[in-house]
């Protein structure tokens, strides 16, 4: 018999596995050096001026926890995550701009937090996007529920939407160089 606790552990395992796969799919240092050399020689075709409103990756994985502080400690002690007050920040390289460091935030939230509302789910995914204003217009045209207005911070722009199954989604147009300047320990 599968209990709710086992279902929650399974969901967390799947979500965490996705995050690890995403973060580990980054360019190797050799590939990074090759791309930098191409860029210096002017033959780099990886740069893109594409401003199509779309998702470009996963920006964060958020989920409920009975005790976020203890859970962060468990992940740090057992899986080697570098933790901070929000969870753990994964660092990886942008495949199109290898000199650019990007981030993925992993965060346990205290069970019952209103941050996921109006969703009834125990998780929320943050997607990295480009051209958030254009994306919001596209979503409005498509009849998608937009929960709030775009909010701007030093480290990027955010808006929340609902998908067709009632999952709250956070969209983030990041300004990664600001996060890089802030520094702090990251999981690599």
Language-model region placement:
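Bacterial N-terminal signal peptides that target proteins for export
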Residues: 2-12
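Core segments of cupin and vicinal oxygen chelate
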Residues: 52-53, 62-107, 157-159
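Vicinal oxygen chelate
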Residues: 26-66, 85-86, 113-188
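Hydrophobic helical h-region of N-terminal Sec-dependent signal peptides
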Residues: 14-19
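A short, acidic/glycine-rich surface segment
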Residues: 109-115, 179-180
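C-terminal motif of bacterial Sec signal peptides marking the signal peptidase cleavage site
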Residues: 21-24
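Residue-level signal for short segments within beta-strands and strand-turn junctions
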Residues: 94, 110, 173-175
């Amino acid at each position: 018999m599968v209990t709710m606790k086992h279902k929650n552990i399974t969901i967390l395992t799947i979500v965490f596995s996705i995050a690890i796969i995403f973060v580990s799919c980054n360019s190797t240092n050799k590939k990074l050096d090759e791309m930098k050399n191409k860029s210096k020689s002017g033959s780099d075709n990886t740069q893109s001026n594409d401003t199509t409103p779309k998702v470009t990756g996963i920006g964060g994985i958020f989920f409920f926890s009975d005790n976020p502080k203890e859970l962060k400690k468990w992940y740090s002690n057992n899986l080697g995550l570098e933790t901070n007050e929000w969870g753990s920040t994964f660092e990886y390289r942008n495949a199109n701009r290898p000199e650019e460091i990007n981030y993925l935030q992993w965060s346990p939230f205290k069970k019952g937090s209103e941050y996921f509302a109006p969703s009834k789910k125990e998780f929320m995914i943050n997607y990295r996007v480009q051209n958030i204003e254009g994306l919001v217009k596209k979503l409005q045209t498509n009849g998608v529920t937009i929960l709030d207005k775009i909010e701007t911070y030093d480290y990027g722009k955010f808006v929340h939407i609902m998908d067709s199954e009632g999952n709250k989604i956070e969209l983030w147009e990041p300004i990664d160089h600001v996060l890089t300047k802030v520094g702090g320990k990251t999981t690599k």
